[in-house]
Amino acid sequence: MAKAKFERTKPHVNIGTIGHVDHGKTTTTAAITKVLADAYPELNEAFAFDAIDKAPEEKERGITINISHVEYQTEKRHYAHVDAPGHADYIKNMITGAAQMDGAILVVAATDGPMPQTREHVLLARQVGVPYILVALNKCDMVDDEEIIELVEMEVRELLAEQDYDEDAPIVHISALKALEGDEKWAGQILELMQACDDNIPDPVRETDKPFLMPIEDIFTITGRGTVVTGRVERGTLNVNDDVEIIGIKEKATQTTVTGIEMFRKLLDSAEAGDNCGLLLRGIKREDVERGQVVVKPGAYTPHTEFEGSVYVLSKDEGGRHTPFFDNYRPQFYFRTTDVTGVVKLPEGVEMVMPGDNVDMSVTLIQPVAMDEGLRFAIREGSRTVGAGRVTKIIK
């Protein structure tokens, strides 16, 4: 069957759900797709909760691990929606997920109010540069007391303000479950939530004019056709039959040609900044490429191993380290989609760095990473995020 072409008629916005485990992120995502499919059937299809929640581990522990992508349209926009993991163990995915958002819907259960992971996700959203957050106050059908709801709203606004988000952001009262069940009143609230997204999440400033760059998130082999790499285009545009380079992580760059571009199971002639897509690469084997590398316009970018960065070290309360670190500290530096070990050199006169400190540091990575000034990274020890920073200067 020939694949339908993806139409580029409306502004395209990447959005996602974040928040504490069991507050209803995935149910909210499912409710949005259902309500929009009912309201604009010619534009949308509904995704069932189970389809969004389809990570195998998910079934055993009731925690979202993999990132699910769904798409939907309002009258004004086309949205690609990631359902971001809600459990502290899966912050690694949260980082890759949150990095793909032009705005986020923070789901907070009115029955609980903000919880530790609510705070953690807002902090992470700030670190990885999610520009705007609005709030879906979920499970409102279960709270009769207006005062409780007002109290929760105040707490949420304080939390947003703490991380420099808009404390006057819309807080929409929803019941995702009731909306999924077809309750008209609550379906109306989901439409109000989407109206709030249309009105408040700014049209993303796309980086279309810069040379092409796409970090590799995943790699697949398609029998008889070759190797496909998937990811979100960070910059530039790409046409079918363009030559590209794959750089970073490995010693040598790999040259190849893009023989096909796919988005949401539809074929495209081109891809541009902001698109989540798959690139079919000529003559490339599965083992020639790995997550963490980037696909770029030939000659436009170079991988580096030494840089200076400005870093915020998470406090103990934020889930960071409990003890200071010293010169020659060797954590993992998380760039875009992967961890690379690096050795930290502290500035002269700085003997140690305490949790909660800001510090400028020089870093030498054990593998090269395609970077330029302003690129954000997280510092991690195993699965725990202990710092967040941005590259301030390339040394080598």
Swiss-Prot record:
Region G1: which residues?
19-26
Q: Per its database record, what is this protein's job? A: GTP hydrolase that promotes the GTP-dependent binding of aminoacyl-tRNA to the A-site of ribosomes during protein biosynthesis.
**What EC number(s) does this enzyme carry?**
3.6.5.3
Q: What is the lineage of its organism?
A: Bacteria, Bacillati, Actinomycetota, Actinomycetes, Mycobacteriales
A GO cellular component annotation here is: cytosol
Major site of localization recorded for this protein: cytoplasm
Q: Which GO terms describe its molecular function?
A: GTP binding; GTPase activity; translation elongation factor activity
The record's listing under PROSITE patterns reads:
G_TR_1, G_TR_2
Q: Where is this region: G4?
A: 138-141
| Renumbered residue ranges of the record's region G3 | 83-86
Q: Which UniProt keywords apply?
A: Cytoplasm, Elongation factor, GTP-binding, Hydrolase, Magnesium, Metal-binding, Nucleotide-binding, Protein biosynthesis
Signal sequence span is none
- Tell me which family the UniProt entry assigns to this protein: Belongs to the TRAFAC class translation factor GTPase superfamily. Classic translation factor GTPase family. EF-Tu/EF-1A subfamily.
Tell me which InterPro entries the record gives.
Answer: EF-Tu_GTP-bd, EF-Tu_GTPase, EFTu-like_2, EFTU_2, G_TR_CS, P-loop_NTPase, Small_GTP-bd, T_Tr_GTP-bd_dom
Q: Which residues bind Mg(2+)?
A: T26
Residue span of region G2 = 62-66
Q: Where is this region: G5?
A: 175-177
Reaction(s) catalysed by this chain's protein: GTP + H2O = GDP + phosphate + H(+)
Q: What is this protein called?
A: Elongation factor Tu
Could you tell me where this protein is found in the cell? Cytoplasm
Residues binding GTP: 19-26, 83-87, 138-141
Q: Where does the record place the tr-type G domain?
A: 10-205
